[in-house]
Amino acid sequence: MKRTFQPSTLKRKRTHGFRARMATRGGRKVLAARRAKGRVRLCP
């Protein structure tokens, strides 16, 4: 059985990156919540 985590920088950025977050309304809400909480990193 293969491991479920197969790291890829491109896939990571495309799904969880800043631009991906900004593209949807829900993603913008995520960023707003993380800013309100005072997170150092908004996106991984």
Swiss-Prot record:
Family of the protein in this entry: Belongs to the bacterial ribosomal protein bL34 family.
Signal peptide annotation: none
Coiled coil: none
PANTHER family found in the cross-reference section: LARGE RIBOSOMAL SUBUNIT PROTEIN BL34M (PTHR14503:SF4), MITOCHONDRIAL RIBOSOMAL PROTEIN 34 FAMILY MEMBER (PTHR14503)
Keyword tags: Ribonucleoprotein, Ribosomal protein
A biological process term (GO) from this entry: translation
Gene Ontology annotations for the cellular component aspect, listed alphabetically: ribonucleoprotein complex; ribosome
GO MF assignments: structural constituent of ribosome
NCBIfam families membership: rpmH_bact
One family name in Pfam for this protein: Ribosomal_L34
Protein name: Large ribosomal subunit protein bL34
Record's keyword annotation contains Iron: no
Organism of derivation: Thioalkalivibrio sulfidiphilus (strain HL-EbGR7)
Statement: the UniProt record of this protein carries the keyword Ribosomal protein: yes
